[in-house]
């Protein structure tokens, strides 16, 4: 075990701390879900249109969860004027089948694209491609947010990348793409539905064209109204670009559901068993001080099934927990960091032996075709003469290499530290895991603030100490600012706002969300990793 059992008082304090973090997260998310606010929502309704979130709620099956990702994107930028970057993305169940959904939020700057909108849509498309599931686009966008065009239009991962992914899904991967034009769809954005398999347009409220009436008048001198230029009637009866006309939003969404009923049935689900411990107690597991130890088993026994949990090499390199288990009946391989003092070692650190242990375990999971779930609380690799003498660099490379080349699904849950190269080795985002989730307690960054202070100022501080001089106020302020900056940068919400994880989640939802994500990954037949496959398409 990684620490002694906590007292009742400690449990109460821990639960109160986590509850505070979750309530703060919920308040922020509730505000972001309002989009442009009540007045903009009323304007959308007055135009005879549902909001993006109302459309999604109507589209997915009743009493099923919409697993949203990217909700916090750009929340702390643009003076709060770009909630969720003006687009709602996530996974929903439509007629029993999992699908990615991308819905422009027209209450936010008329659904215009911000610089952060592009990577958010690309991430949604990558999830569809990586997991081989359909994608639905609910289009209601004024196009590029022109004052920010330099961060939207050009570049390898600019707006054009969306259409590149459209083309790959349509021509190479043969993934169903359904586009519903439920408002404006202007300029280059019109290629998104045009590169989909099915295009539905809504009478009177939809428009699709490479240029709107104002642009057409400026370019050609021709005066024409929006409906005549690119409305549902023109594109269904004259141009033939669209395939179906819907009377209103509700009818449009019903037509999408009808299309899904024609798709192959989803995989069957195995019979699950309950976790060994109730999820209600999960708030009391992590200490408020991120540096203190706790029992990682108290996390795992609340998320994974009680049956068939078998730890691999429990007495060898115990700072890394490797186990086979089940998640709602599905076989999984689990890799987690143990935190605390495991004499003579320190938990949360990857040593030479633990790196090789994990590498072998990943290879075993790969041979068996078992998905891997990483539970991250890692401070990095061990350093020093002994570690270098034992070949920590080579062992770490083996751990990274086996993880990188694994073709089985990989899902990451960060519950505390995700620091240094250890973050990379534990299937960090740069290694294309299928999904990445974080608790509000997650701390994602190259190092902690105290470590950064030592790296930046230790030489200067040592010099002052030797000379017996006091620390100048300017230096003291710089040190305080460094610590404050790192606290902000390490925060899970900061990471999520920049797309460094798919979502920050309530710990009590961990089992449900990981199950949804896992079942989505099971749609994809085993193959080479997506990063390699993309290079050969």
Which residues are covered by each model-predicted region?
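Ligand-binding clefts of soluble mixed alpha/beta catalytic domains
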Residues: 1-537
């Amino acid at each position: 075990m990684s620490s002694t059992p906590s007292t009742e008082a400690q449990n109460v304090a821990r639960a109160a701390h986590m509850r505070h973090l979750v309530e703060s997260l919920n308040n922020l998310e509730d505000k972001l879900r309002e989009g442009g606010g009540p007045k903009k929502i009323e304007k959308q309704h007055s135009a005879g249109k549902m909001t993006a979130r109302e459309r999604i709620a109507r589209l997915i099956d009743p009493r099923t969860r919409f697993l949203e990702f990217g909700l916090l994107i750009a929340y702390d930028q643009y003076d709060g004027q770009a909630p969720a970057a003006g687009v709602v993305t996530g996974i929903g169940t439509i007629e029993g089948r999992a699908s990615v959904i991308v819905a422009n939020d027209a209450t936010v700057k008329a659904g215009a694209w911000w610089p952060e909108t592009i990577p958010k849509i690309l991430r949604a498309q990558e999830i569809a491609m990586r997991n081989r599931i359909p994608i639905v686009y609910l289009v209601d966008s004024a196009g590029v947010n022109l004052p920010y065009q330099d961060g939207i239009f050009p570049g390898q991962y600019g707006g054009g990348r969306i259409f590149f992914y459209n083309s790959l899904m349509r021509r190479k991967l043969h993934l169903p793409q359904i586009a519903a034009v439920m408002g404006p769809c202007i300029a280059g954005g019109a290629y998104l539905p045009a590169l989909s398999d099915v295009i539905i347009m809504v009478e009177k409220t939809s428009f699709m064209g490479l240029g709107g009436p104002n642009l057409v008048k400026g370019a050609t001198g021709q005066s024409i109204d929006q409906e005549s230029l690119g409305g549902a009637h023109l594109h269904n009866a004259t141009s033939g670009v669209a395939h179906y006309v819907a009377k209103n939003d509700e009818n449009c969404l019903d037509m999408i559901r009808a299309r899904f009923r024609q798709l192959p049935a989803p995989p069957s689900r195995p019979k699950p068993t309950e976790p060994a411990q109730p999820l209600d107690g999960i708030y009391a597991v992590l200490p408020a001080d991120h540096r203190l130890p706790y029992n990682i088993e108290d996390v795992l026994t609340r998320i994974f099934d009680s049956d068939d949990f078998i730890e691999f090499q429990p007495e060898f390199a115990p700072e890394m927990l490797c186990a086979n288990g089940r998640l709602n009946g599905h076989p999984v391989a689990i890799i987690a960091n143990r935190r605390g003092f495991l004499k003579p070692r320190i938990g949360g650190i990857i040593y030479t032996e633990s790196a090789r242990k994990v590498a072998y375990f990943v290879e075993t999971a790969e041979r068996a075709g078992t998905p891997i779930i990483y539970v991250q609380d890692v401070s990095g690799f061990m350093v020093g003469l002994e570690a270098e003498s034992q070949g920590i660099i080579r062992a770490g490379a083996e751990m990274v290499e086996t993880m990188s080349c694994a073709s089985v699904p990989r899902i990451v849950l960060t519950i505390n530290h995700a620091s240094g190269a250890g973050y990379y080795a534990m299937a960090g985002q740069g290694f294309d895991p299928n999904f990445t989730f974080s608790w509000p307690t997650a701390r994602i960054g190259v190092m902690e603030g105290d470590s950064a202070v030592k790296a930046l100022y230790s030489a200067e501080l040592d010099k002052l100490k030797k000379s017996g001089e006091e620390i100048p106020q300017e230096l003291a302020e710089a040190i305080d600012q460094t610590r404050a900056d790192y606290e902000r940068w390490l925060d899970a919400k900061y990471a999520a706002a920049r797309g460094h994880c798919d979502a920050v989640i309530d710990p009590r939802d961990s089992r449900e969300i990981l199950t949804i994500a896992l079942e989505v990954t099971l749609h994809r037949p085993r193959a080479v990793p997506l990063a390699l496959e993309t290079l050969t398409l």
